[in-house]
Amino acid sequence: MKPSCYDNVGKAVKRKCETTIAQKRDISLMDTGANTYLIRPNYKDKFKAGVAKECIGEILREQLYGVQYDPEEVPTLSRSLADSIKHKLKDMAFDRYKFIVQVVIGEQRGEGVKMAARCFWDADTDNYAQEIYMNDSLFCVAAAFAVYYY
C-alpha cells in the first residue's frame, strides 16, 4: 500500500496546507484560577477535620432522624448521604482538595462491628473526618477523606 502522498500512478503529489487563526489569545495572561506551582496549602485553606466532622454529623442527624432500617432502602440512602456530604464539603471552599466519602449503614442488632481504613497520603496536607450516628434501628458511619491536589 502506497502512502497517501502518492497518486495512483506513483508520482509524488504536493499538498498545500493553509491555516487561519480565528482568534488570538495570550495564554500566558489568562486567569487559570489556582497557582499550579503551589505544593502546600496555606494554613487558612487547609482541610479542617473538626469543622468537617461537625458538618458530617449535622447531615447525618438531619437525614437519619426517625429513619428505620430497611435493607431495600439502604443503598439509595447511603448514596444520598455520601452525595450530600461531598457537596457540603465542596461548598466549604477547601481549595484544591478532592474528597472521597464513604457511608456504611447497618442494622442495629446489638452485635459489634469493626471497621478500618488505611491510606497512603501526605500527612502534611491530607486528612479525614468521620462521624457515627446511631438510633434504635440502625447505625451509620460516614468518613470523608480529603486529599490535596498538587
Swiss-Prot record:
Domain of life: Eukaryota
Keyword Plastid attached: no
Pfam families named in the record: Tctex-1 (PF03645)
Subcellular location: Dynein axonemal particle
Disruption phenotype: Morpholino knockdown of the protein produces a dose dependent typical ciliopathy phenotype, with ventrally curved body axis, hydrocephalus, abnormal otoliths and small eyes. The few embryos surviving to 4 days post fertilization display severe generalized edema, pronephric cysts, and defects of the craniofacial cartilage.
Keyword Cytoplasm in annotation: yes
MF terms (GO), sorted A to Z: dynein intermediate chain binding
Main location: other
Keywords for this protein: Cytoplasm
Function: Acts as one of several non-catalytic accessory components of the cytoplasmic dynein 2 complex (dynein-2 complex), a motor protein complex that drives the movement of cargos along microtubules within cilia and flagella in concert with the intraflagellar transport (IFT) system. Required for proper retrograde ciliary transport.
Stated family: Belongs to the dynein light chain Tctex-type family.
Protein name in the entry: Dynein light chain Tctex-type protein 2B
Species of provenance: Danio rerio
